[in-house]
C-alpha cells in the first residue's frame, strides 16, 4: 500500500481472522428479506396457541432441512471438490429447492451461492470450502440454538430465514441520514438506509423493498436529520430497525457522525463477527482519512497515522470514488461506509470544514 504522500508502505488495518471469506455480499440481502415481515402466525390469526403450534411445526421442518443439508455437505467433501465443478449449478438448485420446502429461505440462498463459486475464477476451491464452513456453522447453530445466548440464537433464526418483529422499545432521536442505496436482483429491489442518532449515538439500518424494476417507497435525503422513533429487530447487533412515528419532516443539520481511525474500524468489524459470524460488513465513519491510489485500486489512509483500509473492488468502477477524490483534493475528509472482509465501501463524505454531505452511492 502507498502512504498518503505516495511514498513508502502503509500497513493495512488488520482484517480479523476469518474475515476474508465470502464471494460477495448477497447473503445478507436474502436473510434480511426473509426477516423483514411481521411475525407470520400471530399477525395473521391473533391466536397465540395456534401461532405456537405453527412455529413448532416450522422449526421441525427447518431442522429436517438443516440435517439433510449437513449430510449433503459431508457428501461433497468426501467426494471431492472436483465433483462440484462438474455438477454445475443443478446440484445446488436441487438442494436449495429442498431448503425452500423446509421453509428455510436463508439456507436456500446460501446454497444457491455455493453453485456460483466454481465458476468464479482462480482460487474457487478455497472460497467453496470457506462458504461450506460458514454454512455448516449456520446449520449447527440452528441445530443447537437452545444452547446459544439469546442474541446469537436470534441471529441464527434470522440468518436461517425466520421472520421476526421489531420488538425493541421505540427510541426517539434526531436521526442523521448517513447513506441510502439500492441493490436489485431478478425478483426484488432492496433499499438500505443508514441512520445515526445524535443523542443515542446509535447507528441503525432501515430496509425497504420494491418489486423488480421498481424503487422502494421509503426515501430519506442523505445529510438531513429526521425527528422520529425507531424500534430494533431482535438480533445480536440490533442494528436493523423499523421506522415508527415521525414528528417532523427531514431538515438540514450540522450533525456529523463521530469518526474512527482505520485500525479502529477493522477492530470493530472483528468484534461484530463474534456476535454474528456471517456478517459481511459493519457501518463505520472514518475521521480524517485521505483517498490515495494503491496499485490498481484505492485505499483510505489515516492522515494522522500509518494505517489504511483498501476500498472494495467495486468502488473503483463507480463515479462516487471520483466525487470522493474531488472532495478531498488531498486533504483529510470524513467518510461513512461499510467496513468488511472485502475492504471499505464509501457511501457518504463530508469535507474537513463546513459543508454538506456528499452522497457517493
Segments predicted by a language model, with ranges:
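Short Cys/His-based metal-binding microdomains
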Residues: 1-37
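Intrinsic-disorder/low-complexity coil detector
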Residues: 3, 10, 15, 148, ...
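Long, compositionally biased intrinsically disordered terminal regions
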Residues: 98-103, 110-146, 154, 158-181, ...
Amino acid at each position: 500500500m502507498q502512504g498518503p504522500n505516495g511514498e513508502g508502505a502503509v500497513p493495512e488495518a488488520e482484517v480479523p481472522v476469518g474475515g476474508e471469506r465470502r464471494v460477495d455480499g448477497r447473503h445478507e440481502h436474502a436473510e434480511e428479506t426473509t426477516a423483514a415481515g411481521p411475525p407470520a402466525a400471530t399477525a395473521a390469526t391473533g391466536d397465540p396457541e395456534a401461532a405456537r403450534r405453527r412455529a413448532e411445526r416450522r422449526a421441525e421442518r427447518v431442522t429436517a432441512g438443516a440435517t439433510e443439508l449437513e449430510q449433503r455437505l459431508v457428501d461433497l467433501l468426501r467426494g471431492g471438490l472436483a465433483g462440484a465443478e462438474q455438477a454445475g449449478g443443478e446440484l445446488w438448485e436441487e438442494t436449495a429447492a429442498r431448503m425452500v420446502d423446509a421453509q428455510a429461505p436463508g439456507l436456500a440462498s446460501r446454497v444457491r451461492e455455493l453453485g456460483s463459486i466454481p465458476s468464479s475464477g482462480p482460487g474457487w476451491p478455497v472460497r467453496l470450502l470457506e462458504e461450506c464452513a460458514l454454512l455448516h456453522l449456520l446449520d449447527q447453530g440452528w441445530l443447537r440454538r437452545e444452547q446459544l445466548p439469546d442474541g446469537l440464537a436470534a441471529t441464527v433464526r434470522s440468518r436461517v430465514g425466520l421472520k421476526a418483529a421489531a420488538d425493541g422499545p421505540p427510541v426517539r432521536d434526531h436521526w442523521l441520514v448517513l447513506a441510502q442505496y439500492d441493490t436489485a436482483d431478478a425478483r426484488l429491489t432492496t433499499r438500505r438506509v443508514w441512520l445515526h442518532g445524535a443523542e443515542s449515538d446509535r447507528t441503525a439500518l432501515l430496509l425497504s423493498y420494491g418489486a423488480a424494476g421498481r424503487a422502494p417507497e421509503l426515501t430519506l435525503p442523505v445529510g438531513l436529520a429526521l425527528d422520529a422513533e425507531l424500534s430494533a429487530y431482535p438480533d445480536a447487533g440490533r442494528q436493523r430497525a423499523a421506522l415508527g412515528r415521525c414528528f417532523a419532516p427531514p431538515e438540514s443539520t450540522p450533525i456529523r457522525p463521530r469518526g474512527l481511525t482505520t485500525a479502529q474500524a477493522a477492530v470493530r468489524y472483528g468484534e461484530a463477527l463474534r456476535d454474528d459470524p456471517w456478517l459481511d460488513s459493519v457501518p463505520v465513519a472514518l475521521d480524517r482519512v485521505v483517498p490515495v491510489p494503491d496499485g490498481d485500486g484505492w485505499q483510505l489512509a489515516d492522515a494522522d497515522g500509518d494505517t489504511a483500509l483498501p476500498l472494495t473492488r467495486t468502488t473503483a468502477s463507480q463515479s462516487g470514488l471520483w466525487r470522493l477524490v474531488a472532495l478531498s483534493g488531498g486533504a483529510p475528509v470524513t467518510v461513512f461506509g461499510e467496513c468488511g472482509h472485502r475492504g471499505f465501501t464509501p457511501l457518504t463524505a463530508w469535507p474537513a470544514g463546513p459543508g454538506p454531505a456528499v452522497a457517493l452511492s
